[in-house]
């Protein structure tokens, strides 16, 4: 299975600079033999403009959220079907910033995941413990409950482990900590989903950069990376993509 590198642009990117960025990423990707799967997740406002630019580039289009309802009276929200209509293939759900800023619960993430799957999107469901949970030795309990609460029966998407305390810090988790948690997450997926849990891709996220990607991506059970700030420039994103080649 090829590695997957997902660029989460968060609330960044205006029209022309966003189009320039995907052009630079596409140019760089074209020079990489047997590249990994690459997904870019711009803000909603850039999806329609960027989608056509990705055709034939090997880069898939992703979004950063969707509403749990298929349609209806939800002012300001975006449905999974609307995303699919724009050519979106992936959607990030349950990111810690959504949970923090919008009070999203595991139940909400689960409902959004079901809606995304029904619309033909591949959900990338984020899980991760806080600094306080890590300090008190509750990391595994927190992750276990998130897996149980956020992933619906028959889940067939991607899981992204992002320790909340590492996001935006500039310092990813230590390799041994990542390895330990990845092993635990895999065991929990198998416990919850049986044999299907063995094939669910797990990404690592949390201050991933070109310097550390080469040591993170080869860790057992790591199937790729969910990249935040380093995805906002081609010269910081492409080194992560290159680190995933041949893994």
Swiss-Prot record:
Tagged with keyword Magnesium: no
Matches recorded under PROSITE patterns: TIM_1, TIM_2
Family recorded in the similarity comment: Belongs to the triosephosphate isomerase family.
Single GO molecular function: triose-phosphate isomerase activity
UniProt key word DNA repair: no
Designated name of the protein: Triosephosphate isomerase
Cellular compartments annotated: Cytoplasm
Reactions it catalyzes: D-glyceraldehyde 3-phosphate = dihydroxyacetone phosphate
Pathway annotation from the record: Carbohydrate biosynthesis; gluconeogenesis; Carbohydrate degradation; glycolysis; D-glyceraldehyde 3-phosphate from glycerone phosphate: step 1/1
Active site: 95, 162
Gene symbol of the encoding locus: tpiA
Gene Ontology terms: cellular component: cytosol
Enzyme Commission number(s) of this protein: 5.3.1.1
Main location: cytoplasm
Quaternary structure note: Homodimer.
Role this protein plays: Involved in the gluconeogenesis. Catalyzes stereospecifically the conversion of dihydroxyacetone phosphate (DHAP) to D-glyceraldehyde-3-phosphate (G3P).
Keyword annotations: Cytoplasm, Gluconeogenesis, Glycolysis, Isomerase
